[in-house]
């Protein structure tokens, strides 16, 4: 098992910067605003042959009794319980604070080994920076710089030397990865908690509470899965803080990293243009899609009918997706939603045999041929699979550039029904067999081979005739002269 290291400390001491250093990524948002990383964030790292997990926590505010900072403190304590080792970060520039002392008191009660790291120590005297932190009674302080990497390697190496070498493992198998997307405050984190059965993601009544995209691994019926809880995507004009701008980018990246996108809508609000925009982004990315209409239990029957009409009118392009009307707070409809997520993943990663694809194509053409485009009728010869996530079918033939969009939709529906491709986009590509010399300029120039060879033969024949004539003139003797002698 890989050891798990939790990064703990008060706000703005450099935990996210150190997280990025340990994972060699920029997964955690880094900004000079206290309390920016408001949830646990998981990452992978490796020193030599020893891999490890890292948990980046929100800033620990142990003296706050209510509000979102209190929720962040509870999340931090849960991260400590999950970890195998704890790195307690303090700020070497600011020095020792009363809040550091309170956090140290909490950590001394934990059975986990705690390593004290004095961050932002670049350019300073290590002994001077570490001196005042001996008061915390957490062992030898490690002076590091998360931004520049000074001392980080030796800190992690010391932590990992207390854990055995990992056994050889097989390559990680591919498994479903779901990105939970949607506008702010529609219940995405509540839905993730309902699926997982625990309050792993902060769900607070504040739009944009989850600013980072949280990757959460879990198992269901013995199979591994990963859920990505993205930051709420705001309308561009409402993204005022630089932090929220970063979060929108993270949400888009999460969709790219996922197999399936779960679009969460709020039944208590009208279907907005931004809902369609977010769905369109997932569609353009080629991701399988499941739609969860949340807060369904809190609206009237009349409102429900109105929501369904709005969905069919504004989200008409999601005809391939499965819609679920759920209540994440009361955990209603979660099982059916998860079944559709699994089905969408299976459809996105399907492998279709070429003979069957070609038979389906020939059956579709036999039932309805593509319409003529002028004097030309497209001819489809065979088809094969060209990719997965989303599935791509490549059709080969002649004059396929003349196929209309309506006929492409007909083929899409035919293939979707034949292979049960529910929940995933399906792309059809046409590979046209064209004449490479269709343009006159591209045609090769004909060489006058016969004409050249014929003229050569004529010249040779005429030459032989002339040579004969010359020989006859030289050897011709008169008969009379012979007898007269």
Curated annotation (Swiss-Prot):
Annotated GTP 2 binding sites: 182-189, 229-233, 294-297
Biased composition range(s): Basic and acidic residues: 457-469
KH-like domain segment(s): 350-434
Annotated EngA-type G domain residues: 3-167, 176-349
InterPro entries: AAA+_ATPase (IPR003593), G_ENGA (IPR031166), GTP-bd (IPR006073), GTPase_Der (IPR016484), KH_dom-like (IPR032859), KH_dom-like_a/b (IPR015946), P-loop_NTPase (IPR027417), Small_GTP-bd (IPR005225)
GO terms, molecular function: ATP hydrolysis activity; GTP binding; ribosome binding
UniProt-listed GO biological process terms: ribosome biogenesis
Region (Disordered) residue spans: 435-485
Keywords: GTP-binding, Nucleotide-binding, Repeat, Ribosome biogenesis
Xref: Pfam families: KH_dom-like, MMR_HSR1
Biased composition (Basic residues): 470-485
Repeat keyword on record: yes
Keyword Nucleotide-binding in record: yes
Binding site for GTP 1: 9-16, 56-60, 119-122
Chain's role: GTPase that plays an essential role in the late steps of ribosome biogenesis.
Subunit record text: Associates with the 50S ribosomal subunit.
Family: Belongs to the TRAFAC class TrmE-Era-EngA-EngB-Septin-like GTPase superfamily. EngA (Der) GTPase family.
Descriptive protein name: GTPase Der
Organism: Neisseria gonorrhoeae (strain NCCP11945)
Source species taxonomy: Bacteria, Pseudomonadati, Pseudomonadota, Betaproteobacteria, Neisseriales
């Amino acid at each position: 098992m890989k050891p798990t290291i939790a990064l703990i400390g008060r706000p703005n001491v450099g935990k996210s910067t150190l997280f990025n250093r340990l994972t060699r990524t920029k997964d955690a948002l880094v900004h000079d605003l206290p309390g920016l990383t408001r949830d646990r964030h998981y990452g992978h790292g490796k020193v030599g042959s020893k891999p490890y997990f890292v948990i980046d926590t929100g800033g620990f505010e142990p003296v706050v009794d209510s509000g979102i900072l209190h929720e962040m403190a509870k999340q931090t304590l849960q991260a400590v319980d999950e970890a195998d080792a704890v790195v307690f970060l303090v700020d070497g520039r600011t020095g020792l604070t009363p809040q550091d002392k309170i956090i140290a008191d909490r950590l001394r009660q934990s059975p986990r080994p705690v390593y004290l790291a004095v961050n932002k120590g670049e350019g300073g005297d290590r002994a001077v920076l570490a001196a005042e932190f001996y008061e915390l009674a957490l062992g030898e302080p490690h002076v590091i710089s998360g931004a520049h990497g000074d001392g980080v390697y030796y800190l992690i190496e010391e932590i990992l030397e207390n854990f055995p070498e990992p056994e050889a493992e097989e390559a990680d198998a591919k498994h479903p990865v779901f990105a939970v997307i949607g506008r702010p405050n529609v219940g995405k984190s509540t839905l993730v908690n309902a699926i997982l059965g625990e309050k792993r993601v902060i769900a607070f009544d504040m739009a944009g509470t989850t600013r980072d995209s949280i990757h959460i691994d879990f198992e269901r019926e013995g199979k591994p899965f990963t859920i990505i809880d993205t930051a709420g995507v705001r309308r561009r004009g409402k993204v005022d803080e630089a932090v929220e701008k970063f979060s929108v980018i993270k949400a888009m990246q999460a969709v790219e990293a996922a197999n399936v996108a779960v679009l969460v809508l709020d039944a208590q609000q009208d279907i907005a243009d931004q809902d369609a925009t977010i769905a369109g982004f997932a569609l353009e990315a080629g991701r399988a899609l499941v739609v969860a209409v949340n807060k369904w239990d809190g609206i009237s029957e009349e409102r429900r009918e109105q929501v369904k009409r709005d969905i069919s009118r504004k989200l008409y392009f999601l005809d391939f997706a499965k819609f679920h009307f759920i209540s994440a707070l009361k955990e209603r409809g979660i099982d059916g939603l998860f079944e559709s997520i699994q089905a969408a993943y299976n459809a996105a990663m399907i492998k279709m045999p070429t003979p069957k694809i070609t038979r389906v194509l020939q059956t579709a053409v036999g039932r309805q041929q593509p319409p003529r485009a002028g004097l030309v009728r497209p001819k489809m010869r065979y088809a094969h699979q060209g990719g997965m996530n989303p599935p791509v079918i490549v059709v080969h033939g002649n004059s396929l550039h003349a196929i209309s969009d309506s006929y492409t939709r007909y083929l899409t529906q035919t293939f979707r029904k034949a292979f049960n491709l529910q929940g995933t986009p399906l792309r059809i590509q046409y590979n046209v067999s064209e004449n490479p010399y269709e343009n006159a300029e591209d045609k090769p120039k004909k060489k006058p081979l016969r004409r050249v060879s014929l003229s050569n033969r004529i010249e040779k024949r005429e030459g032989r005739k002339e040579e004969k004539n010359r020989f006859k003139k030289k050897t011709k003797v008169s008969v009379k002269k012979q007898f007269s002698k």
